[in-house]
Amino acid sequence: MSVSQKVLVLGLGASGRTAARFYASRGFEVLAADTRPQPPRLDELQKEIPNLKFLGGAVSPVIVAEVSEVMISPGLSPEYSVFAPAVKEAKHRGIAVVGEIELFARELKKLKAETGYAPKIIGITGTNGKTTTTMLSTAIIAEAGKSVVAAGNVGPNALGELEKHRQVGTLPDFWVLELSSFQLETTESLHCDGAALLNITEDHIDWHGSMEKYAAAKRKIFSADTVRVLNREDPGSMLSAEGVPSDLVHTLSLIHISEPTRRTP
């Protein structure tokens, strides 16, 4: 973000508002747009960021030339929403189009470089079961005596939680992130130490454009060395085991459960 000190935030839901605050706190001028002429809590945000410029409705692609980065909220498709022309123009110009999780991932890397903070990151995705698995994983980690924060699609948003815990000195040992395909689509820097892909069934095709693009977004949860937990009963999940060292792949099944090993007396 060196070309310009101006950024464009598309969508002023919870993630967009958090991103706007984040950018403003780093000295950037924030342009913000929303499909609604008066999104909830806009007045509050404008009081927090006095020089915030708000645009209601579609954004002219011309405005992209003024900014160095575009942040798009997860509910807005980069390709099929009213903001698609602006996103297309940004990509054409080589301007990064990111989501809130990408900002979270960047800040983690910055914190590690500056302070050595290196928490374990657990990612959870899948068409169904994300929230339940996220909550169970968080409870198990807490029961083991580790400090842990659950965030992401389950709420609250990860960037906001990172900012909050950094300010009060309570950064956790673990982050458990529920990640939707929408969030993963605009994420490049996140490195999960472990991640679960529970299942992939047809969903959100109107947002992604095709089943193939939807599945590809889900698989972005994995880095090359991420420990993967996959569902043996789901072909879409198991595709993520292909070409991966066996020690990085763990599978589960709720249908075919092996008999427990019995000890001989």
Please provide the spans of the model-predicted regions.
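Short, polar loop motifs at secondary-structure junctions
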Residues: 35-39, 58-59, 180-181, 232-236, ...
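Short, glycine/serine-rich, charged loops/turns that create anion-binding
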Residues: 14, 37, 129, 155, ...
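Phosphate-binding loop of NTP-binding sites
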Residues: 24, 62-65, 78-232, 236-247
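Active-site regions of enzymes building and remodeling cell-envelope glycoconjugates
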Residues: 49-55, 243-254
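Single conserved hydrophobic/aromatic residue that forms the stacking wall/gate
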Residues: 255-265
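N-terminal leader/targeting and accessory segments in enzymes
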Residues: 1-99, 103
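Conserved functional loop/turn residues at catalytic and ligand-binding sites
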Residues: 27, 191, 261
